[in-house]
Structure formats: C-alpha cells, structure tokens
C-alpha cells in the first residue's frame, strides 16, 4: 500500500524561560493595586506613529518626534508632540474623558468634539486620534466588581528566543466581561507574561465585540517606586493608526493643576467641530464666533 504517512519536524518549540504561577484572584488584585498606586503621571516620550493599512492600501511611517504626556485620574490627558529639529509644536491635544480638543499648528486647524465621535475616513490622520484611547491604554483600569466579570484563560504567545527562533510561551489571559444596558459584552482581555506576571498586552473591545484597541507593554522599569512599562504601543485597527510611546522620563503622582489640561483656541485658526456634519464642520474663527 506504500507509505501512508510522513514525519516532519515541529517548527515551534516551547520557551525554556522559567515561568511563574498565579491565580485569577491574584492577577485581578495586581491590576487593582497597580491602578491605586498611580493617580497621575508626567512623561517625556519619543513618539513613533504609523498610519494606514489594508483599507487605505498603504502605510505611512512618520518620523519619530519628542513629546510630553500628562495624565490625571479619573480621565484627564494632555499630550504634546514637537516637530523634529526645530522643536516647535506638531500637535497639542487635551481631553477630560468626554470631550477633546486638538490643535495642529502646521495646518492651522483646531479640532473639537466628543471622544466617541469617529472619523476613520478622514484625510487628516491626526483627527482620527482620540486622547481617551491613549489614556485607556496608558493606565490599565482595575476590574470593577459591580460591573465586570473576569475569567482566567491559560493561553500562549509566540516569541523569539535569543537566537531568533520562534518559540511558544505560556501566558495568563484575563478575559473581562462587562454588564451594559444592552446586556453582558466582551470588554477587555489583559494578557500577563508568565515570566514576570506583568500585563504585556491589553485588548479593548467595542460594544459589538470588535477589537478597538490593541495595546502592548514592554520593558518594565521602576519609576518613583512603581513598576511601569517604558514602551507602550497602541494600535487602533478600525482607524488604522499605530502609536508607540518610548518613555524617556516619568514622574508618578506629582500634583497636576487643572490649567495643565487646558487648551485655548488660537486666534485665526480654522475650527473643526467633529460633532457636526462634515459639510459644516470646518468654519473660520470669525464665523464660529458669529454663530454663538
């Protein structure tokens, strides 16, 4: 009958790194403790940004720029990016958790709107970015016992060893289900490395169960006695943009004033209201004042 089978090598092997054990309760508690330790942060960062993908048919990589990030609970964020070499402002954005403002000096555009207003087809890539999405990736929220159910899954991830070989490594995956007005929905998945039991990835889902944010965390360091990732990558698949923050300096729990999260409308700027129909969204400053 001839040979009915053949033997072939297995390409993936398991990582030989020593792995730590934990439990569902311990991982939930670690998220809560980390959240309690950080009430505010102020960071100097290098920002890498890419825009595009299958929908646009191409990807544009932007030159790395220096930036500053301020965050304060419960939902305040202020992020500034500086143009290379000249170090003038490339963008300036603030959010109070509900509404945001975005100032883009090179285009003389001042954008305002709610964080839940999406513009995925915008010809202005910066206008697809929402400060609230950055905030949610930056500071992992604790599990809310009144609204969340967290289920532990033993999973695995693909890594590369020191020789560049592809290996499998077991991880812990905390799947968070949230109670909403429409019922229970998939909210988040937090992936913990079994090497250090730190969150190394977080998926945030929309109410339809689609991945809204894919955040990766790497190179944890101690800042003011608190362990925090020095590299955070945020990918938004629907809007097709990717932002990586490489932290150069981080101060935790320093007092931050309300005026540090304020952004005034510059005189002469083109004002874009994303809450309005796109045909009437952009109005000159004089017109926007006359309609008040």
Predicted segments — roles?
Residues 150-268, 272-277:
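Gly/Pro-enriched, hydrophobic low-complexity segments
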Residues 30, 66-71, 93, 215-222:
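Extended lipid/amphipathic-ligand handling interfaces
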Residues 2-64, 276-292:
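N-terminal leader/targeting segments and the immediate start of mature chains
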Residues 39-41, 65, 75, 89-91, ...:
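Envelope-exposed proteins and targeting segments
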Residues 45-47, 73-75, 81-85, 97-99, ...:
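A mature extracytoplasmic/lumenal domain signature
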